[in-house]
A protein has these predicted regions:
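PLP-dependent aminotransferase-like
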Residues: 106-163
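PLP-dependent enzyme catalytic core of the Aspartate aminotransferase-like
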Residues: 1, 325-329, 333-334, 338-370
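Conserved PLP-binding catalytic core of the aspartate aminotransferase-like
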Residues: 286, 295-329, 345
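Short acidic capping loops at alpha-helix termini that bridge into adjacent secondary structure
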Residues: 36, 86-90, 110-113, 157, ...
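Phosphate-binding glycine-rich loop
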Residues: 64-113
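Active-site pre-lysine segment of PLP-dependent enzymes
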Residues: 147-157, 169-192, 196-228
Length: 370
C-alpha cells in the first residue's frame, strides 16, 4: 500500500527529505525520565513573550469566534510606522517560512534554479524541491555567504537567491559594502531575498540597511523578518516581508485568505510597542554571547563569532554523540551533522543560569572523553 501511495506523488516530491524539528520537551522528559529539560536548540527567546503581547491576547480571546482580519490591517499599519515603509510594500505571513513558500510558488517552475549557501536555512532547499526546481549550493567562505561565488553560479535558469543575514546556523553576516556590490551585479530578472530573522541581535556597525532598498522600490529585492526570535512569539507564527508594491501585490494573490490568526496579529502589534522587552532581550543575548565565548575559549574550543542569538562551536567530537550526551543530562542543543558539520553543535543563548548549565555539562562531557 505504501509503495502504491508513493506513485501518486510527483517524483521530485518523493525525493524530499523533510525538515525534522526537535521533539516536544514534555515528550522528551517522559522518554528520558527527566524532571526538567533546558532547550537551547531552536533559537527561541528565553524570556518568553512580551507581557504587553500576553495582555493583548487576553483581551482578544472573546472574539476568536470571528475570522481574523485577512489583510492584517492593524499589524501592517504598525509595521509601516515602525519601518517608515508604505503599507502596500508589506505582507504578513504565517511565520516568515510561509513567505519563503509564497516566493517559491510564485517564481519557480520545474527546471528553474535557486541559489544559496551550502550551510544555511534548511527550508530553502526543501521548498525549492517542492516546486521541482534545482537548488544550487555555493560553498561557504569563512563560514558565511560567498557573494562572489553566488554571482558566478547565476545562469539563465536562476530565478531566486536566498541570503540569510545573519546566517543560520553560523551567525555570520555579509556587510553593507558586500551587499551593495552584489546587488549591482545581480541580473534584474533574478529575485534576491534577504532573510533577516536575526536582525534584532546584530551589533556590527557595517551590517547592511536593507530597508533602504525597499524604500527606493528595488523591484527584485525582498526582505524577510520574523516575530519568532527577539519578540518571543515563535508559537504564534508571525513573519513579514517588505518589497516593491508590485511584488507584494502578486504575493497577496497566492497567499491563503486568513493565513495569520487573530491572536497572532494582536500579539505581534502589541509586541512592537514593548520596547523595554526588546531592549532586555538584546541585552540578554549580547551578554550571553560574551559569556559563552569566554567559556568556550577556556575549553579550548573553536567557535564562530555570532551576530545572532546562538553560537556555533566545534566540539572536536561527533556532534550527534555530544547531542545525545547532553540530552541525557537534560540539555537540548542542535547537532550540525545535517549541515555537513560533523563535529559542530549550535547553542541558543539562554538565560545566564542556562548558559552556565550548558557550560558545566559540556565541560563534564569533554573531560569524560579524555
Amino acid at each position: 500500500m505504501l509503495t502504491a501511495m508513493r506513485e501518486f506523488f510527483k517524483k521530485h516530491i518523493q525525493a524530499i527529505r523533510p525538515y525534522e524539528p526537535g521533539k516536544p520537551i514534555k515528550e522528551l522528559e517522559r522518554e528520558m525520565e527527566l524532571r526538567s529539560i533546558i532547550k537551547l536548540a531552536s533559537n527561541e527567546n528565553p524570556l518568553g513573550p512580551s507581557r504587553k503581547a500576553l495582555r493583548a491576547i487576553r483581551r482578544a480571546i472573546p472574539e476568536i469566534h470571528l475570522y481574523p482580519e485577512s489583510s492584517c490591517y492593524e499589524l501592517v499599519g504598525r509595521l509601516s510606522e515602525e519601518l517608515g515603509i508604505p503599507q502596500n510594500q508589506l505582507i504578513i505571513g504565517n511565520g516568515s517560512n510561509e513567505i519563503i513558500e509564497l516566493l517559491a510558488r510564485g517564481f519557480l517552475s520545474e527546471g528553474d534554479e535557486v541559489i544559496s549557501s551550502e550551510c544555511s536555512f534548511l527550508v530553502y532547499p526543501i521548498l525549492t524541491q517542492v516546486c521541482g526546481a534545482k537548488y544550487v549550493s555555493v560553498p561557504m567562505k569563512n563560514y558565511g555567504y560567498d557573494l562572489k561565488g553566488i554571482l558566478n553560479a547565476i545562469t539563465d535558469r536562476t530565478r531566486l537567491i536566498f541570503i540569510a543575514n545573519p546566517n543560520n546556523p553560523t551567525g555570520t553576516y555579509v556587510t553593507q559594502q558586500e551587499v551593495e556590490e552584489f546587488i549591482a551585479k545581480v541580473p534584474k530578472n533574478v529575485v534576491v531575498c534577504f532573510d533577516e530573522a536575526y536582525v534584532d541581535f546584530v551589533e556590527a556597525t557595517d551590517f547592511p540597511h536593507m530597508m533602504f532598498h525597499i524604500k527606493t522600490e528595488k523591484p527584485n529585492i525582498v526582505v524577510l523578518r520574523t516575530f519568532s526570535k527577539a519578540y518571543g512569539l515563535a508559537g504564534l507564527r508571525v513573519g513579514y516581508a517588505a518589497a516593491s508594491p508590485e511584488m507584494i501585490g502578486y504575493l497577496h494573490k497566492i497567499r491563503q485568505p486568513f493565513n495569520v490568526n487573530s491572536l497572532a496579529q494582536t500579539a505581534a502589534a502589541a509586541a512592537l510597542d514593548d520596547r523595554f522587552f526588546l531592549w532586555r532581550t538584546k541585552l540578554l543575548v549580547s551578554s550571553g554571547r560574551k559569556y559563552l565565548y569566554k567559556r568556550l575559549r577556556r575549553l579550548g574550543l573553536t567557535y564562530i563569532p555570532s551576530q545572532a542569538n546562538f553560537v556555533l562551536m566545534d566540539t572536536g567530537r561527533d556532534a550527534q554523540e555530544v547531542f545525545q550526551a547532553l540530552l541525557r543530562q537534560g540539555m537540548i542543543v542542535r547537532s550540525m551533522k545535517a549541515y555537513g558539520l560533523s563535529t559542530w553543535i549550535r547553542v541558543t543563548v539562554g538565560r545566564r543560569s542556562q548558559n552556565a548549565q550548558f557550560y558545566r555539562l559540556l565541560r563534564k562531557y569533554l573531560k569524560s572523553q579524555q
